[in-house]
Amino acid sequence: MSVSALSPTRFADSLSGFLQVASVLGLLLLLVKAVQFYLHRQWLLKAFQQFPSPPFHWFFGHEKFKGDQELQEIVSCIENFPSAFPRWFWGSKAYLTVYDPDYMKVILGRSDPKANGAYRLLAPWIGYGLLLLNGQPWFQHRRMLTPAFHYDILKPYVKNMADSIRLMLDKWERLADQDSSIEIFQHISLMTLDTVMKCAFSHKGSVQVDGNYRTYLQAIGDLNNLFHSRVRNIFHQNDTIYKLSSNGRLAKQACQLAHDHTDGVIKLRKDQLQDEGELEKIKKKRRLDFLDILLFARMENGDSMSDKDLRAEVDTFMFEGHDTTASGVSWIFYALATHPDHQQRCREEVQSLLGDGSSITWDHLDQIPYTTMCIKEALRLYPPVPGIVRELSTSVTFPDGRSLPKGVQVTLSIYGLHHNPKVWPNPEVFDPSRFAPDSPRHSHSFLPFSGGARNCIGKQFAMSELKVIVALTLLRFELLPDPTRVPMPLARLVLKSKNGIYLHLKKLH
């Protein structure tokens, strides 16, 4: 009698054979990965042989740089490791961490792409817009969007900025009656989102009044933290493994919330442009704002900009246009709160120029030099973007003779640069005189908006907004620190505080 093909014996034999083959293939794959790990590690060790570093574990890398004290640990290395040191995330992944202005000048003067290993992890969120694009596509998008930040466009934005700021300050008037301090970042983040929506995306209402936008802000905060965690987890570099993880599922949900918001912004503006009156008004404008440029864009081949490209640019600027500014403002306020003499001098300067602040224009922004010096000094101490990463497209030799081969990834630690005692004497001291007009400094010693060809396209927009916010706030409030809640700077895509930024607000009138 023949044994059925479906008999338990035949099935068990087949399963056993399959498991044996799978085990052999699994072991072979593991062996291949181990060899790749070893070879890449040896290549990195050779590439970094001219650059000493703190001790690190052969597999786990520099564990001390992965905690909440990451920024402080980098600063602590500056004295012992001049200019730069290799930072190992794990055994086969390392970056040269740079905090020297001469090194910065060399890297930012080149056309190296953004490091694909780290920045590709942002693609599901912000797509391939200006932040992630490289080469000719980046150049085309940059050239197309630059007119959105022309002075003629920025000048009338001051009124929109002031309107958004006053809404927040009115809310603070009510909160200031309480004895407790308030966490300012959430309020400021909502206000800067309101500003960028009005200025860059032709939004007619106010997101500070509509509570629906808090969901978007929460999603952005979650994505910031999730990206930071993923970059530092060896297993989460694989997209499939990450998607199956709890963090991967959270990231997918947060991305969807962020995309729903930007899709709604794009759809609303498209619907508005269906109105012939609105369309004709826009066509007659000498310069278009950010979103209208995208909607009217024609790429060099004559086709309209794809929906995918359009949303990527909107996602990118929606995030960068509000979150970095919110970080900058929050830390500026904290710096002024902890240095009341400088705060009062700024206030007196603004009062002498603006009176009660009922009217503020573009021309006023160049007439507050001391306030501008204080803003810059706060940006030095607390740069909104603590670091950026490049991947060398060709080998490079630095001014001190040390070199790196093609393919090495370089982290430009802006936080480290700004806290480097060889660049800034007594770097932890708040000293606005560093930015006095006659104060000499290296061209690449101060980089709150990066530098070179890929610097922040909206830096003039951001600086203008910072000046308006600081000026109008100091006319209405005295900022006081909460000594029981000292903020702890935290390395993320954008500089945050682990425990929030709490201030007491004292009404002046």
Swiss-Prot record:
Transmembrane segments: 15-35, 121-141
Membrane topology: Multi-pass membrane protein
Chain sites annotated for binding heme: 320, 456
Residues carrying Phosphoserine: 439
Entry keyword Iron: yes
Disulfide bonds: none
Highest taxon listed in the record's lineage: Eukaryota
Record's GO cellular component terms: endoplasmic reticulum membrane; intracellular membrane-bounded organelle
Knockout-associated phenotype: Mutant mice are hypertensive due to constitutive activation of renal epithelial sodium channels and increased sodium reabsorption.
GO biological process: fatty acid metabolic process
Tissue spec: Highly expressed in the kidneys of both genders.
Reaction equations catalysed: an omega-methyl-long-chain fatty acid + reduced [NADPH--hemoprotein reductase] + O2 = an omega-hydroxy-long-chain fatty acid + oxidized [NADPH--hemoprotein reductase] + H2O + H(+); dodecanoate + reduced [NADPH--hemoprotein reductase] + O2 = 12-hydroxydodecanoate + oxidized [NADPH--hemoprotein reductase] + H2O + H(+); dodecanoate + reduced [NADPH--hemoprotein reductase] + O2 = 11-hydroxydodecanoate + oxidized [NADPH--hemoprotein reductase] + H2O + H(+); tetradecanoate + reduced [NADPH--hemoprotein reductase] + O2 = 14-hydroxytetradecanoate + oxidized [NADPH--hemoprotein reductase] + H2O + H(+)
Listed cofactors: heme
Subcellular localization(s) per the UniProt record: Endoplasmic reticulum membrane; Microsome membrane
InterPro entries the UniProt entry points to: Cyt_P450, Cyt_P450_CS, Cyt_P450_E_grp-I, Cyt_P450_sf, Cytochrome_P450_Monoox
Keyword terms of this UniProt record: Endoplasmic reticulum, Fatty acid metabolism, Heme, Iron, Lipid metabolism, Membrane, Metal-binding, Microsome, Monooxygenase, NADP, Oxidoreductase, Phosphoprotein, Transmembrane, Transmembrane helix
Any Pfam family hit: p450
Keyword Metal-binding: yes
Main location: endoplasmic reticulum
CDD domains on file: CYP4B-like
GO molecular function: arachidonate omega-hydroxylase activity; heme binding; iron ion binding; long-chain fatty acid omega-hydroxylase activity; monooxygenase activity
PANTHER family associated with the record: CYTOCHROME P450 4A10-RELATED, CYTOCHROME P450 FAMILY 4
Family: Belongs to the cytochrome P450 family.
Biological role: A cytochrome P450 monooxygenase involved in the metabolism of fatty acids. Catalyzes predominantly the oxidation of the terminal carbon (omega-oxidation) of long-chain fatty acids. Acts as a major omega-hydroxylase for dodecanoic (lauric) acid in liver. In kidney, may play an important role in omega-hydroxylation of (5Z,8Z,11Z,14Z)-eicosatetraenoic acid (arachidonate) to 20-hydroxyeicosatetraenoic acid (20-HETE), a signaling molecule acting both as vasoconstrictive and natriuretic with overall effect on arterial blood pressure.
Protein name: Cytochrome P450 4A10
